[in-house]
C-alpha cells in the first residue's frame, strides 16, 4: 500500500487543528469536563493497545491476512474527509429508512427521502464515508461513488412484520456492493437473539467474500434479548456483554466494529448466564465511562479491529451528547464515531455543524488517549 507523503499528512493534520477546530469541547462537557478530559486509565494501559493513527494500515493491518486490496480500501477511508490523515473515522449512517421506517426517520426533514441529499450531507460535513442501504446508494452511485467512499449495509430488520422479530435479513449481496464501487460493506448481528447463530454464519461468509473482493468489513455488533433487561436495568449496553459481542465480531472478520457506548457493567452477573471472571470487574474495568469503553476496545483484539461507537437517537442535547461520546471513544482508544439520527433529523446546516463538532474532538490534540 502506498502511503500519502508524510508532509501531506502532517499538513492536513496541522491545518485541521489550527484552522478548523472551532468547538469548545470543555465548555460543552460542562461539569464533566475535568473528569472526562483528565481521567487516567489504570485498568488496561494505553501502551498495550493498537491505537488509531495515520499509519494504522502499515503499523497494524499489515500483520493480518487481508488481501492488499482490503488494505487499499481501508487507506481510502482513512484518507477522506476532514479527518484524513489522522487515523480516525467520521461516518454518516442512514439506514434508518428500513430499520425504523422511512416516515419515522425522514418526516422531520423530507429532503432525505431523496438519496442524493443523504450523500450530499456526508460530503458537505467532511465525513470519511457514507453508509446506507443498497437501494439508497445504488440509486446515486454513478454520480457519487467516486466522490466519497460508500459503505453498503447488507442486512436489515423490517418493521412491518408483527410481532417484532429480533432478526436481520439479507437485502443485498456483496457482489452488488462491489459492482457499485463501494469500498466497504456493513452488517448487523443481533447477538443473544434466537436467530443469532444463523446471522453469524451468514455474515461470516459475506465478510469472507467482501475481503476477496477487496472491501473493508464493518459489523454492527448489537445485543438483542429480553433477558438482558433485568430489575429495571438495560444491560444491552453493558461493557461485559457488549465486549463479548465485539470479540465475536472480530472473530468473524470485522475490520471495524460498531458498538453502542457502554453505559453500565455486570450484565453477565445480572442475567446469571454465560461466563465471566471477577477480574473483569475488579481489575479490567471501573465505573468510569472511559474505562468501560476501553474494555469494549480490548475485546476488539486490543484495537487491531477498530472500535467506533454509535451516536444514538436524536434528543434535546444532541451536540453535548455527541461530543461527550466522541471524547470517551477517543480517550478510550477508539477509532471514531458513526452518527446519523442526531444529524439528519436536523436541518442540513445544523447537521453539518454537529458532525463537524464531533470531528473537532478527534482533531483536537488536547483530547488525548487516557
Q: Predicted segment positions?
A:
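Acidic, Ala/Val/Gly-enriched low-complexity intrinsically disordered segments
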Residues: 1, 12-16
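N-terminal capping/small domains of soluble enzymes
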Residues: 17-153
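Alpha/beta enzyme core
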Residues: 105-129, 136-137, 142, 149, ...
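Acidic-and-aromatic substrate-binding clefts and catalytic sites of carbohydrate-active enzymes
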Residues: 138, 194-197, 315-319, 344-348
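Active-site clefts of carbohydrate-active enzymes
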Residues: 303-316
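Short acidic/histidine-rich active-site segments
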Residues: 337-344
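C-terminal helical cap(s) of enzyme catalytic domains, especially alpha/beta-barrels
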Residues: 344-368
